[in-house]
Amino acid sequence: MTVARSLLLFVLAALLEIGGAWLVWQGIREHKGWIWVGLGVISLGLYGLVATMQPDANFGRILAAYGGIFVAGSLLWAVVMDGFRPDRFDIAGALICLVGVGVIMYAR
């Protein structure tokens, strides 16, 4: 599996997990209803499935590396979906996390 495919799987996993959590949030906190919650739960389940498609056999390594993608992806999601404006520390932290992803997954 190529690095590009692995990164694509990480991005897909992030969309499913962050999107799923956002749907649950919208359903409960924003009172949009249980349909939103149900769609969120389905999305979160699909996230778990996508995570299993990574090439490395070590669950801990995959989830640790994915954590960096999740941090950066969550900030990006907030910008696009909620109008959040990250400050320089948000951006710096996300970039540090992405460097960590590279070291954990692809430095070998």
Swiss-Prot record:
Assigned keywords, A-Z: Cell membrane, Membrane, Transmembrane, Transmembrane helix
InterPro entries: UPF0060
Highest taxon of source: Bacteria
Membrane topology designation: Multi-pass membrane protein
Keyword Transmembrane helix: yes
Subcellular location: Cell membrane
Regions crossing the membrane: 8-28, 33-53, 62-82, 87-107
Keyword 4Fe-4S carried by entry: no
GO CC annotations on file: plasma membrane
Family recorded in the similarity comment: Belongs to the UPF0060 family.
Protein name: UPF0060 membrane protein RER_49640
Species of origin: Rhodococcus erythropolis (strain PR4 / NBRC 100887)
Classification lineage: Bacteria, Bacillati, Actinomycetota, Actinomycetes, Mycobacteriales
